[in-house]
């Protein structure tokens, strides 16, 4: 009997120890310093829901556990790596870009080059064919004036259905042709004056003008000399007292001063 009681007491003692250890463990879990298991479970469930919502949510949370049943949780922000789709339409931009309008106009203006007998040759653009009405209107305007201002040229081109370049080229060709005809003498000066330009007048020869002026001056000098009194050929009365002086000597003596006076008067006129 004593052995039976001893075994019963031993079992009871072991049960008490087990229950006490269970209660102590339960209280330690309910202490404020340790996280509650229910909160931990709810956070884990929330993290699992976030992971299911985003394709990159599996790496959004990290959990570190140690041997003492303590868990520390680190939450990180989830970044959406969707910029590849946003810039998708511009991936091939730059490899083939459409030409600008300036480049297109430049290409149109450049003449076409073809190979003729192994040599490059520029192909001329076809000439503009003007209608009868357009030619008549251009000719009438050319008779009024040979040079057009920019507003006049734009107005004339719009009224005739032509471009300003075509009108400008027509006037340039017409002016060059008109000058050639006028220089060759096929166009009279009156028509050239009517068209807006005055022909150059031939200048008189300078030699003829100088001869006319010189002859007029000489006539004036001669008329002045003819009006003057002729020299006195008689001997003055005061020379009669000197018998050695004759009339021939007096005439010869008085003649040089006469020529001298003529020279002085002519120089004064000139």
Swiss-Prot record:
Alphabetical list of CDD domains matching this protein: homeodomain
Subcellular location, in the record's words?
Nucleus
- Would you say which domain of life the source belongs to? Eukaryota
One GO term under biological process is: embryonic skeletal system development
Which stretches does UniProt call biased (Polar residues)?
A: 30-52
Does Nucleus count among this protein's keywords? yes
Question: Low complexity compositional bias: what residue ranges?
Answer: 54-64
What SUPFAM superfamilies does the annotation carry? Homeodomain-like
Q: In which tissues is it expressed?
A: Expressed in the developing forebrain and fins.
Where is the segment annotated Disordered?
Answer: 19-64
Q: What is its main location?
A: nucleus
**Record-linked InterPro entries:** Distal-less_Homeobox_TF, Distal-less_N, HD, HD_metazoa, Homeobox_CS, Homeodomain-like_sf, HTH_motif
Q: Which Pfam families match?
A: DLL_N, Homeodomain
User: Which GO molecular function, any one, fits this protein according to its record?
Assistant: RNA polymerase II cis-regulatory region sequence-specific DNA binding
Q: Which UniProt keywords apply?
A: Developmental protein, DNA-binding, Homeobox, Nucleus
Keyword DNA-binding attributed? yes
Residues in the DNA-binding region annotation: 123-182
A single cellular component GO annotation: nucleus
Entry similarity comment? Belongs to the distal-less homeobox family.
Explain the purpose of this protein: Involved in the development of the inner ear.
Record-given protein name: Homeobox protein Dlx2a
Give the source species: Danio rerio
**Which gene holds the coding sequence for this protein?**
dlx2a
């Amino acid at each position: 009997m004593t052995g039976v009681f001893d075994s019963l007491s031993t079992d009871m003692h072991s049960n008490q120890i087990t229950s006490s250890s269970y209660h102590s463990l339960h209280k330690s879990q309910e202490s404020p310093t340790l996280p509650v298991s229910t909160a931990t479970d709810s956070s884990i469930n929330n993290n699992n829901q976030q992971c299911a919502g985003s394709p990159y949510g599996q790496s959004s949370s990290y959990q570190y556990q140690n041997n003492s049943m303590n868990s520390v949780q680190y939450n990180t922000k989830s970044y959406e790596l969707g910029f590849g789709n946003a810039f998708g339409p511009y991936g091939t931009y730059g490899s083939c870009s459409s030409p600008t309008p300036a480049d297109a106009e430049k290409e149109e203006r450049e003449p076409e080059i073809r190979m003729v007998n192994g040599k490059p040759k520029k192909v001329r653009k076809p000439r503009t064919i003007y209608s009868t009405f357009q030619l008549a209107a251009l000719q009438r305007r050319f008779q009024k004036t040979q040079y057009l201002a920019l507003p006049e040229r734009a107005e004339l081109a719009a009224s005739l259905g032509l471009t300003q370049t075509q009108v400008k080229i027509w006037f340039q060709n017409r002016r060059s042709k008109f000058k050639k005809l006028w220089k060759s003498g096929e166009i009279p000066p009156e028509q050239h004056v009517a068209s807006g330009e005055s022909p150059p007048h031939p200048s008189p020869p300078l030699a003829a003008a100088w001869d006319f002026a010189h002859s007029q001056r000489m006539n004036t000098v001669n008329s002045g000399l003819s009006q003057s009194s002729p020299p006195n050929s008689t001997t003055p009365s005061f020379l009669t007292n000197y018998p050695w002086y004759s009339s021939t000597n007096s005439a010869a003596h008085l003649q040089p001063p006469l020529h001298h006076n003529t020279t002085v008067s002519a120089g004064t006129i000139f």
